[in-house]
Structures are given as structure tokens and as C-alpha cells.
């Protein structure tokens, strides 16, 4: 909820993203439809943020909804299916942020050393594919740092915050933790996610 609030407005109160919230309880089919709707247009930027449970089975990584059955082939939404939707999208800048266990699996191919990202795609995840996402104070540690970055911790001298600067902020903040964020991107330049008042006047 806090992530949505931060992305809705810039630091000066001007509107930013048109946010659609999908809060618990949500069914797998509803979330999948929401993801498809998010990336079906041709806008400048579309951003998917998911915070919840992640699971890996023999077929790869999944994000998990409350109605999912453990060990079912269709447990949750496959990360590879999310990538198919994102890679086919005509949106210019496509951003996926996942705060769940095993999130680093998204974007991987059968060849573990390679990721399959079409032009304009950026992915930021809370942890590697073989790691669990830590919680602190009832919230994901990654999401807490994401919010800190969006509030201004990841801003440049002009007050602009990009997905690249958010990753750098979170990675540095997690330096003493075993959890490592993963960043994958295929862009020529980063778009600004949010603008805040610069801490230093220039």
C-alpha cells in the first residue's frame, strides 16, 4: 500500500503513476488478468509490483495467490508466463518489481547464465532465485528499502529516481545481509519513476 501511495504522486504532490491496487485476498485468475491488462497498451511506462509468496517447483518460479494449491502444476502464476506477457508488450518501458522468495528466477532461461529480456524491460527482485525474502516488522525488508528509495534515498542531484538508482540504493543497504537483490535490464536509458525535491540545491 505504501509503494502505491509513493508511486501515485511525485514529491511535490503532482500526479505520477495511475495505480491499480490488487490487495488480498486475490485469486490467481484475477491477478493474471490484471497483469495482462497492465501491459496490453502502448504507454510510455508500465510497472508491476508484487509483494507476497514465491515458490519454485520442477517447472520454475511462481508467484503465489491464496487460492493456490501446494504442489499443483498451476500453483500461482509462473514467472516465465509473466515474462512472456512483458516481453510481448508494446509499452515502451516495462518494469517488474517482485518482493517474494525465489524472485530472482524471473527472466531466467534454461541456460542459467542468461536472461531473456526484450528491449525496454527492467526487472528488480528482492533476492536470488535460491534465496528467501526476509521480513522485518511485519513487512518485507526489500519493500521497506524500496519505499526508502522512492521517498528520496535513491534520488540523484536533480531529485529523479529511476529503477537503476533504486537497485543501487537497495543493494548498498543490504550489504550486511545475506539476502541479495537482483537487477536485470535491457534499456538504453532509465526513465524516472518519481521526482522528489533535491536534498541539495544546485
Please report, for each region that a protein language model flagged, where it lies by residue:
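Cysteine endopeptidase catalytic domains of the caspase/legumain-like
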Residues: 1-202
Amino acid at each position: 500500500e505504501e509503494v502505491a501511495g509513493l508511486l501515485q504522486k511525485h514529491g511535490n504532490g503532482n500526479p505520477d503513476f495511475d495505480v491499480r491496487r490488487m490487495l488480498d485476498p486475490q485469486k490467481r485468475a484475477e491477478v493474471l488478468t490484471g497483469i495482462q491488462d497492465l501491459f496490453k497498451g502502448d504507454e510510455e511506462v508500465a510497472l508491476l509490483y508484487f509483494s507476497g509468496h514465491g515458490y519454485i517447483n520442477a517447472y520454475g518460479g511462481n508467484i503465489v495467490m491464496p487460492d493456490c494449491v501446494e504442489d499443483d502444476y498451476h500453483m500461482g502464476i509462473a514467472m516465465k508466463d509473466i515474462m512472456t506477457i512483458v516481453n510481448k508488450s508494446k509499452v515502451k518501458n516495462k518494469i517488474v518489481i517482485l518482493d517474494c522468495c525465489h524472485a530472482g528466477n524471473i527472466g531466467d532461461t534454461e541456460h542459467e547464465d542468461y536472461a531473456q529480456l526484450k528491449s525496454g524491460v527492467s526487472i528488480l527482485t528482492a533476492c536470488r532465485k535460491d534465496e528467501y525474502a526476509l521480513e522485518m516488522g511485519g513487512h518485507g525488508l526489500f519493500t521497506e528499502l524500496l519505499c526508502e528509495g522512492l521517498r528520496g534515498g535513491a534520488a540523484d542531484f536533480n531529485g529523479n529516481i529511476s529503477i537503476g538508482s533504486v537497485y543501487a540504493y537497495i543493494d548498498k543497504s543490504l550489504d550486511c545481509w545475506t539476502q541479495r537483490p537482483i537487477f536485470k535490464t535491457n534499456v538504453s536509458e532509465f526513465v524516472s519513476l518519481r521526482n522528489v525535491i533535491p536534498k541539495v540545491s544546485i
